[in-house]
Amino acid sequence: MKREDVLMEALPYIQQFHGQIFVIKLGGHAMVDQLVLEAAIRDVVLLSYIGISVVLVHGGGPEITDKMKAMGKEPKFVGGLRITDQETLEIAQMVLVGKINDGIVSLIAKCGARGVGISGNDGSLLIAKRKELQVVTIEDRTERVDLGHVGEIVEVDPAILQMLLSNEYIPVVAPIAIDRESNSLNINADTAAAKIAVALHAAKLINLTDVDGVMDAERTHVYRRLKVDETNEMINSGVISEGMIPKVEGMVYALDRGVGSAHIINGNTEHNLLLELFTRDGVGTMIHP
């Protein structure tokens, strides 16, 4: 395709998306390669330049695990769920807020835009409660496990995000929330992104991760478009499994509450974000009502 054809294909999408809000979740695994992350941030800055308001929500699971090991603390998982004691929470805050969040804001500045790093604590953006005991299966037996300082979001106050967006900043949100007693809690970034998208009445919820999208049972084909009902059936049948389940469930939650569409994109490939948004066929999976 000629360069001018690429630009002309993008034009109607640019016109359609101008003035809309996109919430983009940067997956922890998709951020391991610094060059790939820089490319993703350049794409995000481009979106802001053409009139799209972007809120970034980032994860950081792999970096938290690496930091814990470097500090001599072995991460604890039960049934695939991280146990977060007080020391682990402090390490998570150090990594999420002090390292990853600051790094993304610096990259935004490097690309000529203005980013502001916040966590769910700031402006009471994300209010959470401590998760109840979780039922997990261990060696064919079920146990009830206390995950520690892990929360589930019960309320979102988007005022701080609206203020930043109205002043043309790109908010960068770390997945730490606060409870009613002002205690910090670690939260799932996919869930945070979904709930923020709903609170902002976002047009799109986008997940940049390390897979190409929702795949079939044989893992040979990527579904380009799916309806919510289809994703529910695929979860029940096991086609959507493991780490993809919370991503898709978060998107279904958002779509059921007014978000226009949701996208799962491989963030490890440069400019996939732009190709998904501004070409007819896209490169990932779009989920819609």
Curated annotation (Swiss-Prot):
| Biological or metabolic pathway of the protein | Amino-acid biosynthesis; L-arginine biosynthesis; N(2)-acetyl-L-ornithine from L-glutamate: step 2/4
Q: What is its EC number?
A: 2.7.2.8
Domain of life of the source: Archaea
What are the subcellular locations of this protein?
Answer: Cytoplasm
Question: Principal place where this protein is found?
Answer: cytoplasm
Q: Which UniProt keywords apply?
A: Amino-acid biosynthesis, Arginine biosynthesis, ATP-binding, Cytoplasm, Kinase, Nucleotide-binding, Transferase
Instruction: Show the catalytic activity.
Output: N-acetyl-L-glutamate + ATP = N-acetyl-L-glutamyl 5-phosphate + ADP
Stored HAMAP family: ArgB
Q: Please give the family membership noted in the entry.
A: Belongs to the acetylglutamate kinase family. ArgB subfamily.
Q: What does this protein do?
A: Catalyzes the ATP-dependent phosphorylation of N-acetyl-L-glutamate.
Report what the protein is called.
Answer: Acetylglutamate kinase
